[in-house]
């Protein structure tokens, strides 16, 4: 008889979240109070954008990532809308282009100066007018340049070519009620939507047809969300009939029953899912919650595997997620969230603890880069393409103190294996046998030679220690896999 392992093996089992220090937060930001279940925040490797309170119209703030600390009340904003801004989204193919949707029924696309704003930005690059009610959803196509989707409270989905300000597709008969959210699939050939009528729909935008539909995906009356995963499955969040918050996983080929359905708690805030296709981890943030739960999605039942919960004291008003190419890979950072408080934005770093200071190939497979795979015209003609991937290895920066850390650990460690003691002793000799008087009285050449001797000895220790770490990691890997 075979017994299932009590603890499921996962490289993400020990992922932990940690807020940054106070001086790395963005203070004194008046986050929008508008009633709308949006993230209110968008971030890319260059800029942080936050929807803020504004008198006489709608505005959002765009800050260079390094502009932390207290933000001056007179700091310039993007303020061209005549009504409150409801949603913002950075273009995945240009880190200086952002789109916004507003209660004034318009979509605007903005070009942010390379070094950030020095004066209020009131003139968008283009204004897209086609909705008759407020525009609450904005999302760029993942692979086609200049293709933007907007959805409004008029229950209409519009797809635009931003480069020509042209309306490409109008889908006005597929949603009988308010649209809660829209999510493109991996190559942008389909999108899924969650609607107030409790249905999840999968739609082919170019044909204007309904590919699949699941009624009452979640039976509760509160808002739900649906997102596409990289393998084509659909992940949803919502509420049960008893108002308990739920997660579910669906196969679009068969929407009769969910592949998995989990109940979380009975809080009333909408659950906002953030998905990382490289690691198959979904982070779930509830509006008004003070926690972030994260789950790994696999092909093995029960398919949705709880990993851990990051908990803080303050409730979140909104949340932004950094694209993978903006993370610090040298610190084994696999996600970074920008949590909105009432008057500040706090980055939260998700890290996989690793002892090795080398680039972690298993954590960082090639990821979607900033280059568009298609032009808008190609996509309209029926072409599809997956995102163009880039390696994050070039972004890896070894720790500047790596040699110092390793040498200290080896010189001071009493549990060092015998095979390393000779090298350690020779290093200690190289370091301690040089009389201080000689250093003081010797010429520059003598000083240089002594320093070089010490450096060579330390390098040898580093090399040997690195080999030992590699062997131990291999042994640990075999033990975890049950090979030994």
From Swiss-Prot:
Tissue-level expression: Ubiquitous.
Cellular compartment(s): Cytoplasm, Cytoskeleton; Cytoplasm, Cytoskeleton, Stress fiber
Annotated SMART domains: DUF1899, DUF1900, WD40
Gene Ontology biological process terms in this record: actin filament branching; actin filament bundle assembly; cellular response to platelet-derived growth factor stimulus; endothelial cell chemotaxis; negative regulation of Arp2/3 complex-mediated actin nucleation; negative regulation of smooth muscle cell chemotaxis; positive regulation of lamellipodium morphogenesis; protein localization to cell leading edge
GO cellular component terms given for this protein: actin filament; cytosol; glutamatergic synapse; lamellipodium; perinuclear region of cytoplasm; plasma membrane; stress fiber; synapse
Superkingdom: Eukaryota
Modified residues (Phosphoserine): 2
WD repeat segments: 80-120, 130-170, 174-213, 217-260, 265-305
Post-translational modification: Phosphorylation on Ser-2 regulates the interaction with the Arp2/3 complex and cell motility in fibroblasts. Phosphorylation does not seem to affect subcellular location.
One of the record's GO molecular function terms: Arp2/3 complex binding
The UniProt record lists the keyword RNA-binding: no
The keyword tRNA processing appears for this protein: no
Pfam family, one: WD40
Keywords: Actin-binding, Coiled coil, Cytoplasm, Cytoskeleton, Phosphoprotein, Repeat, WD repeat
Region (Disordered): 404-446
Coiled coil: 444-482
UniProt biased composition (Polar residues): 410-430
Transmembrane intervals: none
Quaternary structure annotation from Swiss-Prot or TrEMBL: Forms homooligomers, but does not form complexes with the other coronins. Interacts with Arp2/3 complex components, including ACTR2, ARPC1B and ARPC2. Binds actin.
Function: Regulates leading edge dynamics and cell motility in fibroblasts. May be involved in cytokinesis and signal transduction.
Family that this chain belongs to: Belongs to the WD repeat coronin family.
PANTHER family named among the record's database cross-references: CORONIN (PTHR10856), CORONIN-1B (PTHR10856:SF24)
Entry protein name: Coronin-1B
Provenance organism: Mus musculus
């Amino acid at each position: 008889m075979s017994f299932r392992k009590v603890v499921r093996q996962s490289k993400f089992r020990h992922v932990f979240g940690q807020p940054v220090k106070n001086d790395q937060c963005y203070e004194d930001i008046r986050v929008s109070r508008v009633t709308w279940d949006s993230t209110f925040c968008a971030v890319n490797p260059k800029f942080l954008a936050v929807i803020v309170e504004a008198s006489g119209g709608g505005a959002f703030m765009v800050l260079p990532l390094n502009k932390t600390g207290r933000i001056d009340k007179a700091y310039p904003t993007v303020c061209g809308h005549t009504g409150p801004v409801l949603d913002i989204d950075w273009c995945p193919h240009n880190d200086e282009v952002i789109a916004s949707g507003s209660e004034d029924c318009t979509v605007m696309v903005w070009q942010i100066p390379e070094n950030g704003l020095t004066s209020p930005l009131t003139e968008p690059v283009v204004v897209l007018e086609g909705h008759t009610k407020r525009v609450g959803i904005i999302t760029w196509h993942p692979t086609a340049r200049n293709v933007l989707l907007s959805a409004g409270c008029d229950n209409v989905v519009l797809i635009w070519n931003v480069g020509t300000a042209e309306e490409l597709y109008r889908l006005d008969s597929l949603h009988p009620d308010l649209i809660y959210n829209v999510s493109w699939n991996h190559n942008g050939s389909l999108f899924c939507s969650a609607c107030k009528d409790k249905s999840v729909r999968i739609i082919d935008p170019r044909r204007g047809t309904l590919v699949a539909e699941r009624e009452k995906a979640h039976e509760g009356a509160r808002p739900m969300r649906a997102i596409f995963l990289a393998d084509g499955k659909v992940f949803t969040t919502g509420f049960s009939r008893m108002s308990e918050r739920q997660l579910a996983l669906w196969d679009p080929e068969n929407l009769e029953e969910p592949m998995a359905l989990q109940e979380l708690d009975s809080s009333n805030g909408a659950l906002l899912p953030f998905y990382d296709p490289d690691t198959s981890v979904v982070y779930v943030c509830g509006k008004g919650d003070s926690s972030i739960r994260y789950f790994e999605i696999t092909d093995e039942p029960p398919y949705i595997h709880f990993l851990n919960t990051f908990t803080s004291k303050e409730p979140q008003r909104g949340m932004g997620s950094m694209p993978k190419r903006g993370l610090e890979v040298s610190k084994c950072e696999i996600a970074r969230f920008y949590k909105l408080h009432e008057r500040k934005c706090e980055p939260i770093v998700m890290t996989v603890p690793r002892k090795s200071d080398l680039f972690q190939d298993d954590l960082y497979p090639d990821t979607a880069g900033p280059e568009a795979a298609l032009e808008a015209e190609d996509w309209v003609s029926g072409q599809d393409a997956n995102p163009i991937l880039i390696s994050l290895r070039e972004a890896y920066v070894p720790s500047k103190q790596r040699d110092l850390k390793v040498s200290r650990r080896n010189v001071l460690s009493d549990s060092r294996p015998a095979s390393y003691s000779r090298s350690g002793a020779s290093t200690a000799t190289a370091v301690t046998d040089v009389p201080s008087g000689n250093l003081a009285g010797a010429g520059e050449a003598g000083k240089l030679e002594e320093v070089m001797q010490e450096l060579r000895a330390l390098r040898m220790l580093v090399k040997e220690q690195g080999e030992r770490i590699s062997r131990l990691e291999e042994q640990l890997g075999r033990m975890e896999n049950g090979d030994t």
